[in-house]
């Protein structure tokens, strides 16, 4: 019997619209694939305080490289990089970091709220089988 191999991924989180929100969000997210489970851990600092954060990752289903959007993606020229404007370079919203990521239900109120210091921590084990079924 083959032993399950753990695979780790690391995402460096970079802020967008930092000059507008007047904070420099920072942290690294880790993703650990271990057998039938994906463990997601994200701890955020200096986010806008006391609000819910729709945290998720973006990507391309075909495996193309995703990039952090810049003001070049601000197609409506309002000075903000809006979520729909990110898709050309960052891909689509793939997996939400909410109360049930495997459900792939993006718009709802099940995301974390930052405390008064702009801190929050997300720690979740997600069944890979359920998550993979949403990508078929």
Residue ranges: model-predicted function:
Residues 1-136:
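N-terminal leader/targeting pre-sequences
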């Amino acid at each position: 019997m083959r032993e399950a191999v753990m695979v780790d991924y690391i995402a460096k989180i970079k802020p967008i619209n930092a000059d507008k929100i007047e904070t420099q969000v920072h942290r690294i997210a880790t993703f650990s694939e271990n057998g039938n489970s994906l463990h997601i851990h994200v701890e955020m600092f200096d986010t806008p305080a006391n609000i819910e954060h729709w945290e998720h990752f973006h990507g391309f289903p075909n495996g193309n490289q995703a990039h952090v959007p810049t003001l070049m993606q601000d197609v409506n020229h309002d000075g903000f990089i809006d979520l729909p404007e990110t898709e050309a370079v960052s891909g689509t919203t793939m997996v939400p970091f909410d109360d049930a990521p495997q459900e792939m239900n993006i718009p709802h109120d099940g995301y974390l709220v930052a405390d008064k210091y702009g801190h929050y921590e997300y720690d979740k084990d997600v069944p890979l089988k359920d998550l993979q079924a949403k990508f078929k």
